[in-house]
């Protein structure tokens, strides 16, 4: 066992740097626990506000004997021109704060360097989020290998790798509506330019920031990916080859959450009582409920959210609809009551205003489908739970994840969204899927057609494969062993 080797032979010490956004921090905390379970000392470096978000989950892990500690560093907000109270990416009130936020994050280099000078035992490895390029300078200064964590799947990472090497493909497109085929890909997959996460809509300083991220990616020792070999074998193999063998698939990392409290409190504390949620779910038939959650940074306009709600109502199926960022959706709240929507659906629909215990809900026997924005965490959690996906991508890597789920894995149905929601242009884009489109897509996913049954069968099969991957002898379990042995050899050769 590697945990025995680490104790006897070399006391490995990993320092983890999660990016300050829920979708990035949640899997990084899971990774910390997985490594600590192998006897590795873990130090998580983050800001006070972000540390507070995960206090309960980490305290339970520490109380169980796992060697995890948190070191807090103050975000230099004022120095970067960032107003106080914007310590997380998902709390930014406008796109204008994006550049100051990233500048403040990368100004952490100096205080973190001082931390490393005093840290004991000396770190053997850094695991850093892709969005924190300054950690490359720390790794270089202290001669420590840096492992990168993107928070994406191999399908998406390979797509980005191929398109960066063949950038003329995207650059030569005549319009944003023109389709192109990704070359050198295991499957024939088409995209439009706005659907791939290699371009950006934010001008100016943002290009320099993303350039630093790409440069830091090139100089990292390797990459860990929250996926498993069984889920996307061809893409995992090709991406590993592209990274000269230094890519380890170690997921689904969410499966380290085995107790109810950990499942319920991943990220923020849930805004619904766990017992109340379970009572509602227990009252529904097996596989009958559609879980609807469009992520922590959903930017759909009011007109589209209304159509989504009406489509869910007309589907005549029980549903849970989670609306995060509730304070930004006051108009929707008014519409719920003024239009009579909330009253009409009260017996069949459960509205969760804020944060939901997503893993707890997805693993419940009454849930039979997941309408998702296709963020990779949610996509993987849905597939791991054996649920078919109704895909509604918004931006970033989400169109890649939709293609993987629907076209490659054949475990989902597309809602029909074909263009990203550009920040600041939501109202202009307006409604992309009307209520009839929503109703039709729900039926395609949850209905009794042969296609729907096959999608559900396939999703269940993938869920079983994902669970096997993290068990002893499974691919992800073995890859964690391989990663630790690699870093151990490196650490011993450096001494």
Swiss-Prot record:
Catalysed reaction equations from the record: oleanolate + UDP-alpha-D-glucose = oleanolate 3-O-beta-D-glucoside + UDP + H(+)
Ligand binding (UDP-alpha-D-glucose): 356, 358, 373, 376-378, 381, 397-398
Keywords, alphabetical: Glycosyltransferase, Transferase
Biophysicochemical property: pH dependence: Optimum pH is 7.9.
Active-site residues per Swiss-Prot or TrEMBL entry: 24, 129
EC number(s) given by UniProt: 2.4.1.368
InterPro entries cross-referenced by the UniProt entry: UDP_glucos_trans (IPR002213), UDP_glycos_trans_CS (IPR035595)
The keyword Glycosyltransferase belongs to this UniProt entry's keyword annotation: yes
GO molecular function: UDP-glucosyltransferase activity
Amino-acid positions noted as binding an anthocyanidin in the UniProt annotation, renumbered to this chain: 24, 396
Domain of life: Eukaryota
Family: Belongs to the UDP-glycosyltransferase family.
Function: The monoglucosylated hederagenin 3-O-beta-D-glucoside is a feeding deterrent of the yellow-striped flea beetle (Phyllotreta nemorum).
Protein name stated in the entry: UDP-glycosyltransferase 73C13
Organism: Barbarea vulgaris (Yellow rocket)
């Amino acid at each position: 066992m590697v945990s025995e080797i680490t104790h006897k032979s070399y006391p490995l010490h990993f320092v983890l740097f999660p990016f300050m956004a829920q979708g990035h921090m949640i899997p990084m905390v899971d990774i910390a626990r997985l490594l600590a379970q192998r006897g590795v000392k873990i130090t998580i470096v983050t800001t006070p506000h972000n540390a507070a978000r995960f206090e309960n989950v980490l305290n339970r892990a520490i109380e169980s004997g796992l060697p995890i500690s948190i070191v807090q560093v103050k975000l230099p907000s004022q120095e970067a021109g960032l107003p106080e109270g914007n310590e997380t990416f998902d709390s930014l009130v406008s796109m204008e704060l994006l550049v100051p936020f990233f500048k403040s994050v990368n100004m952490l280099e100096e205080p973190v360097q001082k931390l490393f000078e005093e840290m004991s035992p000396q770190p053997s490895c850094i695991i850093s989020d892709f969005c924190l390029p300054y950690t490359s300078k720390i790794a270089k200064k202290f001669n420590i290998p840096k492992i990168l964590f993107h928070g994406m799947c191999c399908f998406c990472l390979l797509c980005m790798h191929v398109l960066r090497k063949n950038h003329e493909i995207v650059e030569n497109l005549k319009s944003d509506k023109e389709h192109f085929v990704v070359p050198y890909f295991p499957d024939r997959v088409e995209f439009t330019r706005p659907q791939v996460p290699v371009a950006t809509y934010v001008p100016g300083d943002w290009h320099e920031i993303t350039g630093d991220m790409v440069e830091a990616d090139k100089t990292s020792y390797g990459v860990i990916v929250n996926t498993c070999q069984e889920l996307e074998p061809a893409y995992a193999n090709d991406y590993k080859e592209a990274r000269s063998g230094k890519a380890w698939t170690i997921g689904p990392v969410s499966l380290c959450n085995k107790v109810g409290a950990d499942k319920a409190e991943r990220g923020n504390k849930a805004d619904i009582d766990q017992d109340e949620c379970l009572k509602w779910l227990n009252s529904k038939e097996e596989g009958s409920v559609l879980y609807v959650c469009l992520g922590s940074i959903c930017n759909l306009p009011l007109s589209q959210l209304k159509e989504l709600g009406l489509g869910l109502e007309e589907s005549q199926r029980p549903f849970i609809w989670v609306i995060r960022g509730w304070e930004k959706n006051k108009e929707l709240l008014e519409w719920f009551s003024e239009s009579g929507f909330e009253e009409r659906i009260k017996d069949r629909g459960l509205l969760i205003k804020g944060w939901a215990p997503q893993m707890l809900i997805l693993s419940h026997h009454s849930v039979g489908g997941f309408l998702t924005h296709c963020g990779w965490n949610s996509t993987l959690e849905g597939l791991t739970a054996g649920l078919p996906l109704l895909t509604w991508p918004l931006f970033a890597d989400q169109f890649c994840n939709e293609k993987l789920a629907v076209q490659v894995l054949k475990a989902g149905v597309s809602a029909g969204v074909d263009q990203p929601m550009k920040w600041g242009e939501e109202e202009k884009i307006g409604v992309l899927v009307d209520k009839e489109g929503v109703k039709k897509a729900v039926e395609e996913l949850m209905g009794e057609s042969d296609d729907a049954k096959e999608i559900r069968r396939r999703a269940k099969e993938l869920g079983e494969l994902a669970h096997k991957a993290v068990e002893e002898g499974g691919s992800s379990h073995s890859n964690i062993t391989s990663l630790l042995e690699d870093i151990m050899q490196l650490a011993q050769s450096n001494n």
